[in-house]
């Protein structure tokens, strides 16, 4: 799916509804320096999936976001990304403020509640009595919120409502 600003593409993992979504989870390759799309009324979280970090400047404040680390910002924010060590990918959660709620955590062990799991590195998860091995970038949808056990690896676990 093309970015709103036309500067890249994301690969949708899940969303609520049609084109007027309430929440959306996607994996996006970031291959060059440039601005993020301005999305008024949308809260955003992203987690870097690859070893190459992402340098983000959010409303004038710059920080380096490494593999498995998160950046959160409002869709109205002025955000510019740089790829100081080459292309990388991020897993992003976008939630329409006031219409839905959502959160994303990074987990390497333990049990967590979630609806969507995206592997950052090769990972083994347990859900609904079964084990699943996920390659980097693989995702699984658990349906309604359920307990997800992370046996090994590093994953993004997303909880959204409705």
Residue ranges and their predicted role:
Residues 1-162:
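Jelly-roll (double-stranded beta-helix
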């Amino acid at each position: 799916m093309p970015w709103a600003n036309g500067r890249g593409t994301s690969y949708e993992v899940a969303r609520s509804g049609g084109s007027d979504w309430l929440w959306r989870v996607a994996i996006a390759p970031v291959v060059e320096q440039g601005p993020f799309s301005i999305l008024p009324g949308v809260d955003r979280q992203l987690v870097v999936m690859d070893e190459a970090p992402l340098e983000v400047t959010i409303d004038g404040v710059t920080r380096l976001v490494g593999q498995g680390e998160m950046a959160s910002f409002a869709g109205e924010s002025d955000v510019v990304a740089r790829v100081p060590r080459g292309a990388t990918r991020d897993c992003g959660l976008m939630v329409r403020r006031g219409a839905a709620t959502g959160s994303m955590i990074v987990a390497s062990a333990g049990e967590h509640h979630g609806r969507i799991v995206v592997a950052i590195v090769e990972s083994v998860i347990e859900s609904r009595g079964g084990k699943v091995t996920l390659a980097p970038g693989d995702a699984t949808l658990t349906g309604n919120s359920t307990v997800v056990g992370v046996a090994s690896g590093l994953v993004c676990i997303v909880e959204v409502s409705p």
